[in-house]
From Swiss-Prot:
Required for wild-type expression of ArfA and ammonia secretion, not however part of an ammonia transporter. Is highly immunogenic and may play a role in virulence. It is a single-pass membrane protein. It is found in: Cell membrane. Induction: Part of the arfA-arfB-arfC operon. Maximal expression of ArfA requires the full operon. Residues 36-93 are annotated as: Disordered. Belongs to the ArfC membrane protein family. Signal peptide: none annotated. The gene is arfC. Disruption phenotype: Upon operon disruption no reduction of serine uptake at pH 6.9, no visible effect on outer membrane permeability, however severe delays in ammonia secretion, medium pH neutralization and growth also occur at pH 5.5. This is Uncharacterized membrane protein ArfC. Keywords: Cell membrane, Membrane, Transmembrane, Transmembrane helix. GO terms for cellular component: peptidoglycan-based cell wall; plasma membrane. It comes from Mycobacterium tuberculosis (strain ATCC 25618 / H37Rv).
Length: 175
């Protein structure tokens, strides 16, 4: 079994070529033009030829279509009849809105969250700081509250928990 049986490889190649060519080549369908037979007519019709119709030399000359078109002497704006324009009536506008709508800061982690400023400052009255890199939030009772620079501010601890932030504990610090 050391030698390749070359005759089997050749037979497989030949069989593959025969099957491929057999399946790829389809029988040719010849389409033949069938003429309608005219009963009782033995006269042969002439084959169609392309002929140019003869031009009679004595015919009258037609005018070009552009010669019949009239040129407008007035502008289009002058041709449109204008009815009397109604006088412009002023629209009443309220001077000041009845109630001021508070501006809500952009909430990156849902309602009750706000982005921190460049210096880490947040909205007034919001005491919960958050770090988006560690997903931890800090309350004023935590010992690391003051040195922590906030990336996100939360209105309360429930808002931070809804945003899937976890509270800071001594056990969460890596040592």
């Amino acid at each position: 079994m050391e030698h390749v049986h070359w005759w089997l490889a050749g037979l497989a190649f030949t069989l593959g070529m025969v099957l491929t060519s057999t399946l790829m080549v389809r029988p040719v369908e010849h389409q033949v033009l069938v003429k309608k037979s005219v009963r009782g007519s033995s006269a042969k019709s002439k084959p169609p030829t392309a002929r140019k119709p003869a031009v009679k030399s004595g015919t009258k000359r037609e005018e070009s279509p552009t010669a019949k078109t009239k040129v407008a002497t007035e502008s289009a704006a002058e041709q449109i009849p204008v009815a009397g324009e109604p006088a412009a009536e002023p629209i009443p506008v309220a001077g000041e809105p009845a109630a001021r709508i508070p501006v809500v800061p952009y909430a990156p982690y849902g309602p009750g969250s706000a982005r921190a400023g460049a210096d880490g400052s947040g909205p007034q009255g919001w005491l919960v700081k958050g770090r988006s890199d560690t997903r931890l939030y800090y309350t004023p009772e935590d010992p690391t509250y003051d040195p922590t620079v906030a990336q996100v501010w939360f209105q309360d601890e429930e808002s931070a928990a809804r945003a899937f932030f976890t509270p800071w504990r001594k056990s969460t610090r890596r040592t």
